[in-house]
Structure formats: C-alpha cells, structure tokens
C-alpha cells in the first residue's frame, strides 16, 4: 500500500518466523483526539479523511495485494449479521424470541446482504476506517488554536482486514463512528462532499449513492453491535 501512495506506517524490519516487526512510530495523536481538541476544525479534518480514503479506493489490482482476493460477498455479510443475532440478541440480551421470529429477521438480513453484494463495481475498502484508526503526523505541533499545521498528514492503521466492497462502506465507518458521533446536519454535509468529490470512483447517481449508503450504514452498524455485544457478554 505504501508503495502505491497510501499513507501507512513504514515497515523497517519484519521476521515472519518469529512474528517480530519494526515499523514507523506515528505518535499518539489520532483523528478521534484531534476532533475533540479542535471542534472548530471538524469539517476540515473529516474532508481530509474522505479525500485520503479516495487514495486507496482508486487502487487497481496488481496481483500482489491479498485484499483483492477477498470481498464483501453474501457469505461474509451474512456471517456478520449472524454474529449479531448470536452474540447480541442471544448472548447479550438473552432474547426469548421464538426461533421463527429470529429466522424472519435473518431473512430480512439476507435480502440486504444480497443487495449489497450485487453491484459489480466493488473497490478496495479498509473495512475499519474510523477515527481511532487514523493518526495525524507532522513536523509541527497540532495547535488547537490554529488547526492542523501545513505539514501534517493522516496515516491509516489496522487495515489487515481490507477487502473489496462498495465505496460507501468505509464512508459509513468514518461518518457513523460510535467513537466520534456527528450531528445529522454535519453528516449530511460531509456526505454531499463525498458524493461530489468521489464521482469518478462511485459512478452512481445521487439516488443510487444514497441507497447504498443507507444499506451500508445499517449493515455496518449491526456488525458493530455484534462486536460490542460479544465483548459485553464476555465482560
């Protein structure tokens, strides 16, 4: 990814046999922290993150990246929906709903999964692109009074689960982030920005863009609820 222009940490040394790796230190300033410290720069920071997202969404398969062998297909999407049913509904909430009702929920999930998996124009997705996985690095301090310095850069981490999917998936991860809630008005403005700036990538009408945004946001949120439900149930 780094060789193809995506801002990821540089790896200086790795030894797969021992599991040892030495990589670039990105510091401790995440986008999540920067948003809290700079409430007047929220739109600017998110717009930069959206433009950064386009860098990997433009990537073409060069035969080297394993992410292009994986996809958000029906099987993967249903695994995440089933994870929610098993670990949040059954595990955390201890639902007493009859199996027939849970099967009806699963049938509804399957329809959504089939719609999300149907489009052929899938692209490289980070899969967990939220404010805690974006680091701000620069040669100058990030001054809350001045906003981001001119020589800072956003780096991404935690991209090991990357796979092919719709461009809306990473956008949902970013704008429907439980760690950094946005107002509906601000989210709508950032969606407008993403639609206009990303036309060459998504190649959708606004109605199509919004349709897949809504489906992706629902699926991504249910997936997150499954993860948090499992964590809470385990204590």
Where on the chain are the PLM-derived regions?
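Glycan-recognition and catalytic cores of secretory/periplasmic carbohydrate-active enzymes
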Residues: 63, 71-78, 125, 131, ...
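All-alpha amphipathic helical-bundle segments outside canonical DNA-binding/catalytic cores
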Residues: 69-75, 205-217
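Short amphipathic alpha-helical coiled-coil/interface segments
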Residues: 105-109
